[in-house]
């Protein structure tokens, strides 16, 4: 295994389209970072898009056979091997955690795409286009809080002082043990820059359990 990709695939009244592949880093099987567009060869892109489209076409056909529409966002996870071959891992019939980066990278986030699709609005390649300047990369960094109680976010202004950064705090009132409570977003000149900026936002926050 060389690396993993997520291809967000959208089924709507206009058919099936795919977003630019998303790179990701996991810890113990849980998402920690993602970035879009990921770096890959043209052959990997072709394989990834073909596998994602084929998987979703099959699921949509099954849904339609039972009288459903099969519309929405599907997160297709893929393994890229060191020899360049791409293998299917799994598919989530919903917006995907690694796809939170689309809140910074695309014209429409995965959440907006999902809402529009299930409402019957057509989704075309135009709607899934990247909105960041050409040559730049967007990144997300999960903020996982440990403790028992309510999480209070402090030092937010300082954490977001660097241009091209953002923070989305989830509407989760309490944490018991460990829980993903927010996500840091950033746009940078390349993958390393974007990931570092998002990571700096996460590390600069002072999160207290009250």
PLM feature spans:
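Active-site "cap" helix and flanking loop/linker of ATP-utilizing ligase/carboxylase catalytic domains
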Residues: 47-76, 82, 92-149
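Peripheral (often C-terminal) accessory segments that flank ATP-dependent C-N-forming ligase machineries
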Residues: 116-210
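Broad gene-expression machinery/nucleic-acid interaction feature
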Residues: 4-6, 18, 73-75, 88, ...
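Short, acidic Gly/Pro/Ser/Thr-rich loop/turn segments
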Residues: 14-17, 26-28, 96, 148-149, ...
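Short, flexible active-site loops
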Residues: 29-39, 90-103
């Amino acid at each position: 295994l060389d690396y993993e990709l997520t291809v967000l695939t959208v089924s709507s009244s206009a058919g099936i389209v795919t977003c630019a592949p998303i790179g990701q880093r996991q810890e113990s099987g849980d998402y920690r970072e993602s970035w879009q567009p990921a770096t890959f060869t043209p052959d990997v892109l072709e394989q990834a898009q073909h596998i994602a489209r084929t998987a979703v076409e099959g699921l949509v056909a099954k849904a339609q056979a039972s009288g459903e529409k099969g519309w929405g966002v599907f997160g297709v996870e893929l393994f890229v091997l060191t020899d360049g071959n791409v293998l299917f891992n799994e598919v989530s019939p919903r917006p995907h955690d690694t796809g939170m980066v689309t809140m910074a990278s695309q014209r429409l986030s995965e959440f907006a795409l999902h809402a529009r699709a299930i409402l019957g609005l057509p989704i075309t390649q135009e709607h899934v286009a990247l909105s960041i300047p050409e040559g730049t990369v967007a990144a997300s960094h999960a903020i996982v809080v440990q403790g028992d109680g309510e999480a209070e976010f402090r030092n937010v202004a300082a954490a977001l002082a660097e241009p091209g950064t953002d923070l989305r705090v989830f509407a989760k009132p309490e944490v018991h043990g460990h829980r993903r409570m927010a996500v840091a977003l950033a746009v940078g000149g390349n993958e390393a820059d974007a990931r570092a900026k998002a990571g700096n936002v996460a590390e600069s926050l002072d999160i207290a359990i009250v």
